[in-house]
Amino acid sequence: MRVRRQCSPVLHRSLSMNQISQRQGVAALTLGAIGVVYGDIGTSPLYTMKEIFSPATGIPLDATHLIGAVSVIFWGLMMIVTLKYVVLILRASNRGEGGIMALTALAAHAAGKTPGRRTALLLTGVLGAALFYGDSVITPAISVLSAVEGLEVVAPGLKPYVLPVSLAVLVGLFMVQRHGTGVVGKLFGPVIVLWFAVLAFTGVVQILQQPAILAALNPLRAVAFLHAQGWHLFVAVGAIVLAFTGVEALYADMGHFGKRPIQLAWMGLVLPALALNYMGQGALLMRDPSALENPFYRLFPQAWLIPAVILATCATVIASQAVISGAYSMTKQAVQLGLLPRMQVQYTSAREAGQIYMPEVNWILLAAVLLAVVGFGSSSALAAAYGIAVTMTMLITTVLTFFVVRHGWGYPLPVALAATGVFLALDTVLVIACSLKFWQGGWFPLVLGVVLFILMATWKRGRELLIENIRNNDPELLPFISSLAKDSMHRTPRTAVYAVANPDTVPQALLHNLKHNQVIHERNLILTVVFHEVPWIPFEERVQVTPLVPGFWKVQVNYGFKNTPDVPQALELCRDQGLALNLFETSYFLSRETIVPTKGAGMTHWREALFAAMSRNAGSVVGFLRLPNNSVIELGTRVQI
């Protein structure tokens, strides 16, 4: 007898509602990804074609070269963005997170079996992170400038106002950062969707008038164009690479939106819109070479120019906002990985922990962006500075991905080389091409990157020397507290939490407390906050409690580099491990070290002096760990390194 199983109407309806809810969630994330992830690469059509055929490249403006250049752009988008990032690199998630920091941690964990290789991978990742800041300066400058330059097309007499208007837009953008982007952020997706729709529509209009441009879909036209350039190839590629800037955002924002929404957004809207617009600009230039003065804005009829300038300015502001937010996020991760000193972090949303504002980063970025705008003066001049930092970051991403594929995923060496070798060759060509523009402005983002790299490397090495000094000079913890347990010293009926970097030596704050106050608390916690090379640490793994001697416990609080530290909240979890605390009867003792540079130690004297200056200006550990101000006692000590 055959039994036929049927779903109840209620269960069927429940499953349908869940499917609808999931689809709505994916749709919302896809819309968000379009607004945040693709703003940078989506505004590249504003200046790319203009720079490819500028006098600096020497590429003739004729049908053959136009079709060839557009073909290189199209197949570059297919190879670099679609195959490398959308297909391969989005698979390399670090517990769902992406970005150069997450990839570095993943590669170092997978392949860093020896200290030398691990250090090399970490330094490579740190360089990639440092170069990101160069991009964070150039992107707002070139994007806003290129959008506002549309005023020149509207009326040539408005040219003197381009620079002041650009500066005003940028200052306004950075000024509103402290208020957060929660409300305005809801408009990002719809505005950028409209932007891509306009890109596609204006491109189609021109293609219909000059369908010969569709020959650019043939990859042989790209090969022929590159082959015809000879050694001039690198100059041409140095301009074409502008079409790919912003591609790193696909991977960096994976943790915010997820892999699938980013892939859907690219394949469903962004790639078609970009391809159609570049072909449309090529078609326009084939019909009217004089449009080279500004091929993007010449796509529009005269009556549409002012709305086009307004929409382009909105799109570039959104693209800049995404880069600025990325700089905040990157800095916070660098601080928690021990690469930069503590900085003030303000949370601008009660609902979204990822929406933060960092005043120091904001004002330094603003100063650098304004310097770039005033110093270079136009989007064409800035285009020379753009690219070198981006392509070096792309190359570093490919190198790190190789180690993840080979050692993290366990593929044989030939497979790992096959998966990344072509991209490694492409990225190398792009880096060489952009390096030719070093003296024309490429030095600017590189200098920024090198300065950040020196700061990061110095801070990391300085902290290592500091902890080594403490370990060598301070007494061991266990024998010391064992002797205290036998002492009849008066004990205060409260809890003392001693925050330390090295849990195996006696905290300086404890020594000061005993020396000056002649008192010890009933409950003493030797607290260590450890940031791991993973994005998130779940609550059940947040705290580890180890009893030492009566009245003393060692407590380790674990965070990922994207977690937000909150020590009082973490201490409440000690109850689950048999250590019940009353946080209202708890005092936090901190040691603040004053660094004294000493010749002949672990770093050159100038780096020690730099580390000492960074240490003096580091943000308060009280705010960083979210300690209650009225329960903190801070004691100072001088440390030679």
UniProtKB/Swiss-Prot annotation:
Q: Which GO terms describe its molecular function?
A: potassium ion transmembrane transporter activity; symporter activity
Subcellular location(s) of the protein = Cell inner membrane
Record membrane topology: Multi-pass membrane protein
Q: Name one Pfam family in it.
A: K_trans_C
Catalytic reaction(s) noted:
K(+)(in) + H(+)(in) = K(+)(out) + H(+)(out)
Q: Which domain of life is it from?
A: Bacteria
Q: Where are the transmembrane segments?
A: 26-46, 70-90, 122-142, 156-176, 187-207, 230-250, 266-286, 299-319, 363-383, 385-405, 413-433, 438-458
Keywords, ordered alphabetically:
Cell inner membrane, Cell membrane, Ion transport, Membrane, Potassium, Potassium transport, Symport, Transmembrane, Transmembrane helix, Transport
A cellular-component GO term for this protein: plasma membrane
Briefly, what is this protein's role?
Transport of potassium into the cell. Likely operates as a K(+):H(+) symporter.
PANTHER family hit by this protein = LOW AFFINITY POTASSIUM TRANSPORT SYSTEM PROTEIN KUP, OSMOTIC STRESS POTASSIUM TRANSPORTER
User: Record's family?
Assistant: Belongs to the HAK/KUP transporter (TC 2.A.72) family.
Descriptive protein name: Probable potassium transport system protein Kup 1
Please report the organism this UniProt entry assigns to the protein: Polaromonas sp. (strain JS666 / ATCC BAA-500)
* Underlying gene: kup1
